[in-house]
Regions:
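Single conserved hydrophobic/aromatic residue that forms the stacking wall/gate
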Residues: 1-13
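N-terminal beta-alpha lobe that positions the nucleotide/phosphoryl donor
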Residues: 17-34, 40-60, 68-378, 382-392
């Protein structure tokens, strides 16, 4: 730990002044190499030199500088035999503590990379792992080389018999780009791994990576709450009233408009973590004080919560915006319980025929508006044939 602190202090001492880009360009190669060997990410290097611009730009500048300096990771095989015998496996990881790759790269665009779901909590990971494994099986069946990037040892997708190459490494932009530049694949599948791969889609697309299936722009239009809400308004689909708020006064004003209960969600959380239904003022204040730091940097999404509504899910696959297969399932609990924790029955047992018909129609409209090609999930609130979209 003293070495890490020493490297960071050295970077800061040398580069706590001047133009951001010049700071990165003047970073000594030996110091940068030492930082990478000790585990500093490009983000941490940019932060250590005091980069003041958009941090995503800072990461790209650091990346460009180290690539020009020849500071690149190498690929090593994980020794599954503890050095008892020479091990030849496709179980791989990247490191800066090496001089040559353990595997040979063809660079023939004949591989397809699947991004896994990473470390997920109990109740919301098995479906992503199943999707990833099915994608790997299909890739092989179609005659392509299958490549998986994931770091959860408890999943089937990280069994190195499942694919031609398994990178047991982190699902960050930096590491994924390092692997993609080595593999030079035909394309990348982000749609089977859940939130973490989806968050990388736009940044990978900006680097001219071929995203297979639904485009990065369409993924962003579904993931970005404001863009998705505007799209629903444009196609005439109902949704619960909501706002992204940055102060207690704004939250109080919105609650007075819609009344209790309200659903409160801090920004940038995975799998519905830290969501809470607040039924009165005391619960709202306690939750915001304990679980959410409300500010312009950390806005909170507050939604109208409809009591005694049923939550219904549409899981489907579309091609060029047209649904080709679907399944509608029904939550036994009332809305407000996360899908990963809820008890779900399929086929649905207690839905009105009109409710099912409307859900199908709305799903077709959303798939067409987003031009979806691949799997997707839409969550609905249903009460007395009144259908509202929660998210896609």
């Amino acid at each position: 730990s003293e070495c890490l602190v020493g490297s960071e202090m050295c970077i800061r001492d040398r580069h706590s002044w001047g133009n951001n880009h010049k700071q990165i360009a003047d970073l000594p190669n030996e110091l940068l190499r030492k930082a990478k060997v000790q585990g500093f990410s490009d983000f941490q290097v940019a932060r250590a030199i005091g980069y003041e611009g958009d941090m995503e730009d800072g990461i790209l500048y650091v990346r460009k500088h180290r690539k020009e300096a020849g500071i690149l990771p190498v690929v090593k095989q994980i020794d599954t035999l503890a050095a008892e015998y020479p091990a030849q496996t496709n179980y791989l990881y990247l490191t800066y503590s090496g001089v040559a790759n353990d595997v040979h790269y063809l660079g023939d665009h004949k591989s397809i990379v699947v991004l896994g779901s990473g470390a997920y909590r109990i109740g919301s990971s098995v479906e992503f792992d199943w999707c990833g494994v099915q994608a790997l099986n299909t890739i092989r069946k179609e005659g392509w080389r299958s490549v998986m990037i994931n770091y959860n040892p408890e999943t089937v997708s990280t069994d190195y018999d499942m694919c031609d190459r398994l990178y047991f490494d982190e699902l960050t932009f930096e590491r994924v780009m390092d692997i993609l530049e080595l593999e030079n694949p035909h394309g990348v599948i982000v749609s089977t791994g859940g939130q973490i791969p989806n968050n990388l889609a736009l940044r990978l697309d900006a680097q001219n990576i071929n995203i297979l299936g639904t485009s990065a722009k369409s993924i962003d239009n579904a993931e970005d709450r404001e863009k998705f809400s505007a799209m629903l308004d444009r196609i005439g689909v109902d949704q619960p009233r909501w706002r992204e708020l940055t102060s207690m006064d704004d939250i109080q004003e919105f609650v007075e408009e819609v009344g209790f209960p309200v659903l409160v969600r801090p920004s940038y959380v995975l799998s519905g973590a830290a969501m809470n239904v607040c039924s009165n003022q005391e619960e709202l204040e306690r939750f915001l004080k304990l679980a959410a730091n409300v500010s312009k940097k950390h806005p909170v999404v507050v939604s109208q919560f409809i009591e005694h509504a049923k939550e219904v899910e549409m899981d489907a696959v579309a091609q060029n915006g047209e649904i080709v297969a679907y399944a509608i399932s029904e939550h036994i609990e009332f809305a407000g319980v996360h899908s990963g924790d809820a008890t779900i029955q399929f086929p649905p047992q207690k839905l009105y025929v009109e409710t099912v018909r409307r859900i199908k129609r709305i799903s077709r409209e959303i798939a067409k508006a987003l031009n979806i090609s691949g799997p997707f999930n839409i969550q609905y609130l249903a009460k007395d044939n009144d259908i509202k979209v929660i998210e896609c």
